[in-house]
């Protein structure tokens, strides 16, 4: 072997040594994935949360998860499914993560590893503009629609005289509202706001609950959190996703992402005054992320 070849080989070896320490596979990070180095994502199909286009994720949560996955060296694999079966799919290992306006609850935290919040929200009532309902009392003795599997359903069922219809998609619920088969809808705020903004001729309005009733915390509470949910075996990946999410909050890139999808209200970026995750699925000194710029 001549000197030139020896020098080329030495340079190649030096380059590989320089690169390899910073390159770790998902297996080396102890991620529990359906496929090695691939992040299988449950896609329930509602904008502006998380949908797949041309093999990549889009939507508010979609953009965040796409950025995080690329930073962690993971390839995205979208897996379409109904929302009603998505959490079970994560728990049984058929997909790795669920996102797209998934609300944190204490009950879900007992069975899933949940990331730091991608955003914040408050539920509301969708109705005809001339109704303009925004309180629990407005829903009494009315036909109301909501979504299968939503965390606040037990509270919604406690409203006096309320007749509840459940749907597997926001589109189906909105169609029934427009057709008069239900009088109001309590659904996914960003999805409904997005749909109404695209269809002003519907004559609908989505108004946040003004009750903030402590007896109905999941239904009317302020500053609730949207998160990504993973299996309990995937705490390492959940922690790494949280680090990537927090970086997007620190840089305020979350607001730039939100701007693309109509998430412009300060409520989308303002946590609850009550730090309800501290001591539950986070350390007691944990604080929810904010954009301070």
List where the protein language model places each region.
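Bacterial N-terminal signal peptides
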Residues: 10-20
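Immediate post-signal peptide segment of exported/extracytoplasmic ligand-binding proteins
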Residues: 25-54, 132, 137-141, 281-293
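Extracytoplasmic small-molecule ligand-binding "clamshell" domains
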Residues: 27-102, 110, 261-264
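Bilobed "Venus flytrap"/periplasmic-binding protein-like clamshell domains
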Residues: 40-48, 54-70, 102-103, 122-175, ...
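Extended ligand-binding regions for polar small-molecule ligands
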Residues: 62-71, 130, 137-138, 142-143, ...
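Acidic, polar ligand-binding/catalytic clefts
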Residues: 66, 70, 75-138, 210-221, ...
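Paired acidic/hydrophobic, glycine-rich loop segments that form the ligand-binding mouth/hinge
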Residues: 96-101, 183-188, 192-195, 203-205, ...
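Ligand-binding clefts/hinges and TM-proximal coupling segments of bilobed small-molecule sensing domains
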Residues: 154-168, 204-209, 239-291
């Amino acid at each position: 072997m001549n000197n030139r070849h020896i020098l080329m080989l030495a340079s190649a070896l030096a380059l590989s040594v320089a690169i390899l320490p910073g390159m770790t596979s998902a297996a080396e990070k102890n991620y529990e994935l359906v496929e090695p180095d691939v992040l299988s994502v449950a896609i329930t199909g509602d904008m502006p949360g998380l949908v797949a286009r041309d093999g990549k994720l889009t939507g508010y949560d979609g953009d965040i998860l796409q950025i995080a996955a690329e930073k962690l060296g993971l390839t995205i694999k979208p897996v379409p499914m109904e929302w009603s079966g998505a959490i079970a799919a994560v728990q049984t290992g058929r997909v790795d993560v669920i996102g797209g306006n998934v609300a944190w609850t204490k009950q879900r935290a007992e069975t899933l590893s949940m990331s730091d919040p991608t955003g914040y929200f408050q539920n509301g009532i969708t109705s005809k503009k001339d109704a303009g309902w925004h309180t629990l009392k407005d829903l009494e003795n009315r036909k109301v629609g909501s979504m299968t599997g939503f965390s606040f359903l037990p509270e919604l069922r406690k409203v006096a005289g309320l007749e509840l219809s459940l749907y597997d998609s926001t589109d189906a619920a909105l169609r029934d509202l427009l057709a008069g088969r239900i009088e109001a809808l309590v659904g996914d705020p960003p999805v409904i706001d997005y749909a109404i903004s695209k269809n002003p001729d519907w004559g609908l309005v989505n108004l946040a609950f003004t009750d903030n009733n402590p007896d109905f915390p999941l239904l009317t509470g302020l500053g609730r959190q949207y998160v990504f949910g993973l299996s309990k075996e995937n705490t390492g990946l959940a922690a790494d996703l949280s680090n990537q999410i927090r970086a997007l909050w620190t840089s305020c890139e979350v607001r730039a992402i939100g701007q693309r999808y109509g998430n412009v209200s300060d409520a989308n970026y303002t946590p609850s005054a009550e730090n309800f995750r501290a001591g539950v699925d986070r350390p007691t000194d944990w604080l929810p992320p904010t954009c301070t710029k």
